[in-house]
Design a protein with these regions (language model features):
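Conserved AMP-binding/adenylate-forming core of the ANL superfamily
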Residues: 1-20, 60-63, 131-134
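Conserved AMP-binding A3 loop
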Residues: 5-6, 113-141
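ATP-dependent adenylate-forming carboxylate-activation enzymes
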Residues: 12, 30, 51-66, 178-186
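Conserved AMP-binding/adenylate-forming
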Residues: 15-56, 158-160
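Proline-aspartate-enriched helix->loop->beta-strand connector
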Residues: 70-74
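Flexible, low-complexity linker/hinge segments
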Residues: 88-114
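Conserved AMP-binding/adenylation subdomain of ANL enzymes
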Residues: 137-154, 162-186
């Protein structure tokens, strides 16, 4: 039942951005809550690559992704992993933690890639769709135009933000300055 202003969210985004290095890969274990949205927006706006996974994925599956993609940072619910102590804690929020891993930063990150969205979470076979800043921006603006979304509208999150449809609702309504009711129940 809390309300957050765009100013508050913007300040939190800038704070998180100040804590991460450029050319990083960030694994985001997301849930439909304000901290997940702020973390996601921080990483997208800083032009780092985010690997977005849903909190409902089994930890063993997420560990496979970590071994495969070797993220420089992990943003996850506090206590989601039992090994967080072996990484350097950067930020600890109300329910979320940002840790720096021991993996080396990639030297040749494709600046066009911005987001990796899982396509096969239910099969436990890690496959991702790569989205660029242009993909996200074009898609967001297209949805806003087609659905006539503006700052007067209110939406509710009913799909997980780690799914393309759920994320498009968040992206389009944030971009339009709309109100979003963040709901973790589908």
């Amino acid at each position: 039942n809390k309300k957050y202003s765009y100013k508050y969210i913007s300040e939190k985004i800038k704070y998180i951005q100040s804590k991460i290095k450029k050319n990083s890969v960030i694994l985001v274990v997301a849930s439909n809550n304000v901290e997940s949205i702020i973390g996601y927006m921080s990483f997208i706006r800083s032009k780092n690559i985010s690997v977005l996974l849903d909190k409902s994925f089994k930890v063993e599956y997420v560990n496979k992704i970590i071994k495969k993609y070797k993220p420089n940072y992990i943003f996850s619910p506090e206590g989601y992993f039992n090994w967080q102590t072996k990484f350097q804690k950067i930020i600890s929020g109300k329910d979320y933690i940002l840790v720096r891993t021991h993996y080396k930063r990639y030297k040749n990150i494709n600046g066009k890639n911005l987001l990796l969205l899982s396509t096969s979470g239910t099969t436990q076979n890690p496959k991702f769709v790569r989205l660029s800043n242009l993909n996200l921006t074009t898609n967001t603006k297209s949805i806003i135009e087609y659905l006539n979304i503006d700052s007067k509208q209110i939406t509710i999150t009913t799909m997980p933000m780690a799914y393309s449809y759920g994320l498009s609702i968040i992206n389009s309504h944030l971009h339009a300055g709309s109100k979003i009711i963040v709901n973790n129940n589908s």
